[in-house]
Amino acid sequence: MLEADLVSKMLRAVLQSHKNGIVLPRLQGEYRSLTGDWIPFKQLGYPTLEAYLRSVPAVVRIEASRSGEIVCYAVACTETARIAQLVARQRTSKRKTGRQINCQMRVKKTMPFFLEGKPKATLRQPGFASDYSISKKPNPTLLREKGSTLGAKADVDMPPYPDAPVQRHVSMSANSSVTVLRSHPEASKLQFMGYSPKPHCLLLFSPKSSLPAPFQTHISRACPKEVNDNLNQTVEKPNVTPPASYTNKMDEVQNRIKEILDKHNNGIWISKLPHFYKEFYKEDLNQGVLQQFEHWPHICTVEKPCGGGQDLLLYPAKREQPLRSDQDPEKERPPPPPAPRQEVPSKGSPAVMPDVKEKVAELLGKYSSGLWASALPKAFEDMYKVKFPEDALKNLASLSDVCTINYISGNTQKAILYAKLPLPTDKILKDEAQAQGDFDIKSMIEQEYLQIEKNMAESADDFVEDITVPPLVIPTEASPSVLVVELSNTNDVVIRYVGKDYSAAQELMEDEMKEYYSRNPRVTPIQTVHVGQLLAVNAEEDAWLRAQIISTDENKIKVCYVDYGFCENIEKSKAYRLNPRFCSLSFQATKCKLAGLEILNDDPNLVKVVESLTCGKIFAVEILDKSDIPLVVLYDTSGEDDININATCLKAICDRSLEVHLQVDAMYTNVKVTNICSDGTLYCQVPCKGLNKLNDLLHKTEDYFHCKHMTSEYFISLPFCGKICLFHCKGKWLRVEITNVHSSRALDVQFLDSGNSTSVKVSELREIPPRFLQEMLAIPPQAIKCCLADLPQSIGMWTPDAVLWLRDSVLNCSDCSIKVTKVDEARGVAYVYLFTPKNFPDPHRSINRQITNADLWKHQKDVFLSAVSAAASSPGNRNASTPAPGSPAESLRKSHPEVLRKSVLDHTSSFSLEELPPPVHLSKSGEHMDVYVPVACHPGHFVIQPWQEIHKLEVLMEEMILYYSVSEERHIAVERDQVYAAKVENKWYRVLLKGILTNGLVSVYELDYGKHELVNIRKVQPLVDVFRKLPFQAVTAQLAGVKCSQWSEEASMVFRNHVEKKPLVALVQTVIEHANPWDRKVVVYLVDTSLPDTDTWIHDFMSQYLVELSKAN
């Protein structure tokens, strides 16, 4: 589907969901809330949104409201009406993929257990005002409860209402208390101006007839009075005064508009004013200003033609303005923008005396910002010492001839009164003459505007040489895609960002350039050139590209294509002046530095490797430092696994003469087994030139750190995957490579020269000193991956007994021997016979033959490797893993905090319920709380987490990663329905063991996230006391307010799209307690407050969706 057609269809869907139309300033926001994108009117070739809308009359009907606002309505389309209704109600983020080229990066996140979609400081602030527009809404009614830490609650039960705005301010401090805005004049003033204080939880309800019985009550949504603690005492709202900054900005805008009108004595259409404003002052005119002109008689005169036109005319202000002798100029306040006038006539009401109307008009003249109707009697009595007629207050419509009445939410008893301005004398004309005059004026101004546009188009060819191009903004997404163009060294890599606002926008611009330069006969090649000048170049295949002159010659010039980053010598006949219209897009070619390769950036071998692996290809990029030249890591995501390009290039330039090249049938002695994995894989160190040089460098590094004071420059300030650094273990420094960054505090590393992997704190790592860095990087990893050869096929999966026996026999033994039988270069594995010193070189007495003992391969039921000390259960059993002296694992275990080691429980049986943490705190029925939904199945079953506890859960998971990565292993029995720790995708979770399978897997339930997983039984370990303090965070929930016993897959998917991995507000209806904390259940209403001016009650949305779905079926 073409882009224009897709935009038209989505635009119709948005407009059809608003039967009263959408005002033009809000249309972009409504469109984005449905599609996730803005209306791309510029990409479609239109200078403004209004111009695009007027170009599609089959989709949009544009009218002007009574207040002068431009309102857009959908044009009926019978074939898509029903579909559009369903789409309009499903307000999820459906982002168009566009031209996507491998833009998704499966790189490990820096915070894998840090929740997605964390809310902003304030998810929603109703009434937020821009610089020039003041909120027209009165202060909402606030509900307050003393001493509440999770939310605010009134003395009566509040009903859930889908239109009621929900505010909240989330604080991550553990002991933060809730504050709620009180009834205070200054607070009211700030809230009215859009600078409202931010309470933790603030719900505003409105009456609704179809409410659940326990929540039925009637409280006005737009009541202009504050409700205090006992709901009895009320306080009137005071008038408000805009802040000084607002007044200063408004004065500047008024002066500018006055200057524009002085240049157009014959009038100007209000819809054209933003264009002239931006043309003269290089700034956008705030849309809120367009609604205030009728309140600025000293600036302009507003006239609406009666010939059926939809626009308004603005004239310069008349020299003689009505005098207001009683008005104090020092008390003048800028008026708020007028709301749509809602004149509500009252039939059968008594008329108001003319003298009262005159006094009301005179009184309102003193209040340029308007006066609340409820405050009128007191102001009237204070000024005239006469009581205001009660009938007049009940019948505000009777005052409509002397004042303008702005009703609040359609309530005839709540309104703001404004003084009416006298009409200009030249507007009192006869109908026919006025209509003809309006037509003549409109034609004249349209001709003038067309002439101005024509002159601008002609003057554009005069081309101002000093063209300013906006700088390129680095994408905000986590892993944008880039195209590598070329490089001179690894600190100077030319890239282009791939995406909608980058490469796609450039392609659209180049199409426009081709059309402009190919079809415009007035455009001719440039005659005079100078270095630095911007050009449009007619390149190969009739493409038009932006370029900048680097050097000049007689007939040729050297240019750099600013969107591609390469240079070329071209003839002058192909160079044209660049039209300013093509300078709004930033230059797309930019530079970056490859992280980890800075020290070798000029190495020709490295540059050659990087160039061969990257140039002309698209990669996902992790931006580490968003400086002028960003520091990045490139990832190739085209295959099944993500490949770290930086690390791959670094390994490709290692000194091959320092590698160990194993030969088939060769014997090697003095071999040290450094690591044995749970699948029987071994890592060995074979004596060689590289190992000797590495040991020598590590000794020099130790001496260097010993002699030199350790400063902050040697601490790791910017960890990233693939970075090689040092880790101090058992009194010596070892090389490690960062393999996964969990957070700013914890990460996973692999020992390059022993094959071990573990999790460490960032503070425990050190940078390699610069004097040794280049030599250290040149030495290849010295750990050789091996497998025992010729093992019987019947052995199958390695048992814990077999692994422990092998570790006990050869781990860290430095005088073993191996005989190589096969080398699999593709997998990087050597198949060997392994010998201890006593058995070398008899093949029948090798480790390969000894380990085939049948007793070691009996698969014991419900047995796995645990995190309990081996000596605790069987002191004399050598099958328990005891690491040899000097191993990295032993050093890590010894350095682990004593509090964790002491807390390890030596139980082979299950833990009792008394050892479980207390249940997580939930709000009571009728209260609300901030929650996060980590997983959702359907409205009848989803999981919530209390938002206030998320930070504590993140800290706990960091501690679990650090603890279990260095814990010892032993046999232990497992039982169903008991709590353990389990490793799932490189992270450790608190789990409930649900079932034990016969294939070595167990079914577990994540007690903090609510997910069910299958893991290897060896990855399950006891949950120690330290990790049993925090309550389990996952609480099963059910959506209240919907009646459906079975949910279709389609309905379940819609529900998941709206709630899963999102922060929401939950209004608790029922809490179902249970003895087991994981069996507790809560029935809640969910409210999505992420949209700027709309709260989505999920139960109402799902109910409407089911109704529409049934109609469609």
Curated annotation (Swiss-Prot):
GO terms under biological process: germ cell development; lens fiber cell differentiation; lens morphogenesis in camera-type eye; P granule organization; piRNA processing; post-transcriptional regulation of gene expression; spermatogenesis
Tissues expressing this chain: Expressed in brain and testis.
Chain spans, region Interaction with CABLES1: 908-1113
Signal peptide: none
Modified positions (Phosphoserine) in chain numbering: S874
PROSITE patterns xrefs: HTH_OST, TUDOR
Function, as annotated: Component of specific cytoplasmic RNA granules involved in post-transcriptional regulation of specific genes: probably acts by binding to specific mRNAs and regulating their translation. Required for lens transparency during lens development, by regulating translation of genes such as CRYBB3 and HSPB1 in the developing lens. Also required during spermatogenesis.
Protein name: Tudor domain-containing protein 7
Native organism: Rattus norvegicus
Organism placement in taxonomy: Eukaryota, Metazoa, Chordata, Craniata, Vertebrata
